[in-house]
Amino acid sequence: MEEKKRLHLIIADAELETVPPEILDHPAIVNYAKRRKKRPEKIILDSTYHHAALRQLEDGERRGRPDIVHICLLNALDSILNKEDRLRVYVHTRNDYVIYIKPETRLPRNYNRFIGLMENLFEKGAVPEDLELLRMEKKTLNELIEEINPDVVFIMHEEGELMIPKNFGKLLDKFKKPTVIVGGFPHGDFKSKVDGVKISLYREPLMAWTIVNEVIVSYEWEVIKKFKS
C-alpha cells in the first residue's frame, strides 16, 4: 500500500527543558519548586517565573520558553491538515531530546496543565505510559531527519528566500514527504546545524506559531482540495 503524502513539521531547538544543574539552588527556582511541591530538578524551566535565575545561564535570554512549544502544538494538532491525517509533528529540544506526538493527541489548552504534562514526560519518557501519545527519545535533529527520510528539507529562516505562503504551499506539494523545520525559540539562530533550503514567508521576523500556521494552511490548500474534489 502506498504511503500517504504528509507534511512533517519539526519544532527545532525548542527552548523546552527541565531546570539545569547550575541554577538548581537559585532562590527563584527553589521557591517556585516549593510552591508546586516538586523537586527543583523535576520542574520545567520557564522564563515567566525563573527570569532572575536565567541571567546566570548561557543563552539565558532565549531559554525557558515552553509557551512557544505549547502554542505551536495546539495550532498544529487542531489543524485541518492534522485532522485529515496529512501531518506529523515533532519537537526537538535544545538538549537533543525529540518528542514524538501522535496525531490524535489532544493537549491541554491550559498552560499550567501543559507544563505538568511536560514535566511528566521528561520524568517518565512517555505519557500516558500505556498509550504513549507523547514519547521522548534522546536524539539529535539530524538523527530525526534521517529517521523521517524526507525527499526535501525546508528551514524557515528570516534570511531565507522570500516566498509568499501560497507559493510555498505549491512548492511543498511537489514532494511526497516534505519536512519543514521551524525554530522553537524566541530569537537568534538555530543551535543545530542542518542542511536544507532556507525559506522566509515575510519581510520581517515572525513568531514560531505564526510560521507554523502559515506553513500548515499553505499546504492544506494544495493537498486537501485534491481529496475533496
Swiss-Prot record:
In alphabetical order, the GO MF annotations are: rRNA (pseudouridine) methyltransferase activity; rRNA binding
Family as reported in the entry's similarity comment: Belongs to the class IV-like SAM-binding methyltransferase superfamily. RNA methyltransferase NEP1 family.
Q: Which UniProt key words apply to this protein?
A: Methyltransferase, Ribosome biogenesis, RNA-binding, rRNA processing, rRNA-binding, S-adenosyl-L-methionine, Transferase
- By its UniProt entry, which NCBIfam families does this protein fall under? PRK04171.1-5 (NF003205), PRK04171.2-2 (NF003207)
Q: What is this protein called?
A: Ribosomal RNA small subunit methyltransferase Nep1
What does this chain do?
Methyltransferase involved in ribosomal biogenesis. Specifically catalyzes the N1-methylation of the pseudouridine corresponding to position 914 in M.jannaschii 16S rRNA.
Source species of the chain:
Pyrococcus horikoshii (strain ATCC 700860 / DSM 12428 / JCM 9974 / NBRC 100139 / OT-3)
Site entry (Stabilizes Arg-65), positions: 67
PANTHER family assigned to the protein according to its UniProt record, in alphabetical order: NEP1/MRA1, RIBOSOMAL RNA SMALL SUBUNIT METHYLTRANSFERASE NEP1
Q: Which GO terms describe its biological process?
A: rRNA base methylation
Which of this chain's residues are annotated to bind S-adenosyl-L-methionine? 183, 188, 201-206
Interaction with substrate rRNA (site feature) positions: 65, 106, 109, 113
